[in-house]
Amino acid sequence: MYYFNYFFVMSIIGHFIESFFYSSKDSGILMGYWTPIYGIGTIIILLINKYIDKFKINKIFKIIFLFVLSSITLAIIEAIGGYLIKWIFNLELWDYSNHKFNIGKYTSIEMSLIWGLSSIILIYFIKPLLDKIIKKIPKVITYILIILFIFDLSITLINK
């Protein structure tokens, strides 16, 4: 349930972040107040951090590895997400063509660095606070969110 709860909490937070920064544009493809790419990215960061924690290295190297692995992995996920949304829904929700160091339309080195920094902020500042809340979410709430998400995704795909 831990990862499901993180997925939903960060997808919802991601939706509001997108709405705040891009208030003139719809921040996603789903009806609900969630932007799944943030939830997926969070799960990936948590798994990368779990993998790095297996190694007996000092904290500085852990932070560097987290930054590098998250930057690369999340840039790839962002690019795949952009192409999938374009292919499935014929929508372009973001376009980094104007970035100096873009790698195609859907990712750039600038954004990759932001994702790397965000992963450090998530693991070392947000996660310690959020873990206390995440672990207390009742299973029934998680199951309800899963059902609502599947319903939302199904309706969205049917109406594409």
Where are these regions (language model features)?
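Aromatic-rich, lipid-facing transmembrane alpha helices and their immediate juxtamembrane interface loops
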Residues: 1-160
